[in-house]
A protein has these predicted regions:
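Active-site loop/turn elements of alpha/beta-hydrolase fold enzymes
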Residues: 3-8, 83, 132-134
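Short beta-strand/loop motif that positions the catalytic acidic residue
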Residues: 99-101
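Primarily recognizes the serine-hydrolase "nucleophile elbow" in alpha/beta-hydrolase
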Residues: 22-94
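Serine-hydrolase catalytic machinery in alpha/beta-hydrolase-like enzymes
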Residues: 1-42, 143-162
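C-terminal catalytic histidine-bearing segment of alpha/beta-hydrolase fold enzymes
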Residues: 126-189
């Protein structure tokens, strides 16, 4: 299921650049989607994952903090592509998480997520982070093309760079497939 948090709010266009909608405002959307999926006879409620990119990745992490932690009630696994982790430093979850970060991301710098993942792993939680050296924000999106693009209104007008990284994208896709197969297969821990 793909959740669209924007159309119901008037078709917001500049969420990431304009700070119009905070990631926490999307948490009820994800929890409502989870509740809906759990009612469907064609969905195994113990095998539901959550996935987000950038602003949606921040909402993903925030949702995990608000969702039930038991796999039979909440999300079994989560994938977060280039989230901004500064706003979730006190966050914890028992849900398995895969974070995919761009080493050269100047929009959502990887450092806070690397620190968070290390701290959570040290606490015994299943959090994996992979940083792709030289990769920018949006590294998995082929529509961005191989040349860097400056987004001048990002970060309150300071600007940020996006760029497709084919090697990083392919590796991240492989890791996502493996991660979801390991955590959503029937009988997985």
């Amino acid at each position: 299921m793909r959740v669209n948090s924007f159309t119901a709010r008037g078709g917001l266009k500049r969420v990431c650049g304009g700070g119009i909608l905070e990631p926490a405002a999307r948490v009820p959307d994800a929890l409502a989607a989870l509740a809906h999926l759990r009612t469907r006879p064609d969905v195994d409620p113990g095998r539901i994952a959550l996935m987000g990119w950038s602003h949606g990745a921040m909402a993903t992490l925030m949702t995990l903090g608000a969702a039930p932690e038991e796999p039979w009630l909440g999300f079994r696994a989560a994938v977060a592509y280039y989230p901004g982790c500064r706003s979730v430093q006190g966050w914890r979850t028992r849900t398995s998480v895969l974070m995919l970060l761009g080493g050269a991301d100047d929009w959502t710098a990887p450092g806070p997520c690397q620190y968070l993942a290390t701290r959570l792993r040290q606490a015994g939680l299943d959090v994996t982070q992979v940083t792709y050296p030289g990769a920018h924000h949006g590294f998995d999106n082929p529509l961005l093309g191989p040349s860097p693009h400056l987004i001048p209104d990002a970060l309150g007008g300071r600007g940020a760079t996006t760029q497709y990284d084919p090697a990083g994208a392919e590796d991240s896709f492989r890791r996502v497939r493996e991660f979801l197969a390991a955590h959503l297969t029937a009988g997985a821990p």
